[in-house]
Amino acid sequence: MKAGKMIRQITRGEWEVLSAEIDPTGKYLYITSTEASPLEVNLYRVTLSNGKRERLTPANGVHTPLMSKSGRYMIDRYSNHNTPRMIDFSDLKTGKTKNLLCAPDPYDGYAMPDIKCGTIKAADGETDLYYRLTQPAKIETGKKYPVIVYVYGGPHVQQVRDGWKWDARGWDIYMANRGYIIFTIDGRGSANRGSAFENVTHRQLGKIELQDQMEGIKWLKSLPYVDENRIGVHGWSFGGFMTTNMMLNNPETFKTGVAGGPVIDWKYYEIMYGERYMGSPKENAQGYKNSNLNRIAGNLQGHLLLIHGDQDPVVVWQHSLSFLKSCIQSGTYPDYFVYPGHFHNVLGPDRVHLYEKITRYFDDY
């Protein structure tokens, strides 16, 4: 920019720039972006005089590079679905690279499920959405398997990337080895797909996200080995909001849900986040009303467990307590569990208990 006017656009394309830094000489701009794939993060060197880009991270995957002040040396930390962790040191002037760390496979010697990544269309019929499917290694002919949808769905989070095992969590792997299918999809409103993709949920949180999650459910039901009568959903924070949202708006679909630290009414949420995406309750009264899950507490049919830390300063206790009151008034019966002394998440030794609790709930129902 010069005197408030743009001189020229340096980058252009259907991808997102995640970070940018000019080198000391003023000749180059170093950026990380999703140009190669929405699932990857790579480092590029852009010549400011002509806009020419050079990719500096040759391996596929999610890279977290560190540059020297001179711009000559780089430490490249990365992983991809086949590589648990790699650290390389590169001299960008000579092109020489030395490996500093090649982490061993932490799952070596253990039975592993089948983990795959793919795309389906969003509810708009046009946008590609990326999913991760973690399922038992051997699918028996004629057998039907229960499904757990692990959901977040909100802004600034991307759950499916070309990281180690497609970013599958240890609990996903554990549950798949016990006979569950774990499904995760990044719908519209999630991160690293550009502003239009993320901003489509503005002032109407929970609407578009729900539509795209249900497209994922349609696809799951098309698989011959999925038991459509045993579909559950689990998420935390915005994912807890989405879990409750999905259970209440599609009670015939979801048998069981576990919502951790769930947002219930966005007017109770911190202004910094809530008003960024919803506007104020005064100027967007209808949007807040539509996204308030208390108004449809009477729709609950399946088994829903809400979990909350009693010291949560982010999603304050008022969220889940107000929902319990709404359920009492409407005659529905969720389950509830509190972790004393914990904040927005359950950490430390009690986290083992948390995942045992979640696992038992899905096993029981």
Feature annotation, model-predicted:
Residues 35-39, 80-83:
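Short glycine/acidic-enriched loop and turn motifs that connect beta-strands
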Residues 5, 39-43, 51, 85, ...:
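Repetitive beta-architecture junctions, highlighting loop-to-beta-strand starts
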Residues 27-33, 72-77:
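Short beta-strand elements that form the blades of beta-propeller/WD-repeat-like
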Residues 62-365:
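Serine-hydrolase catalytic core recognition
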Residues 1-19, 23-25, 33-36, 46-63, ...:
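Multi-bladed beta-propeller domains
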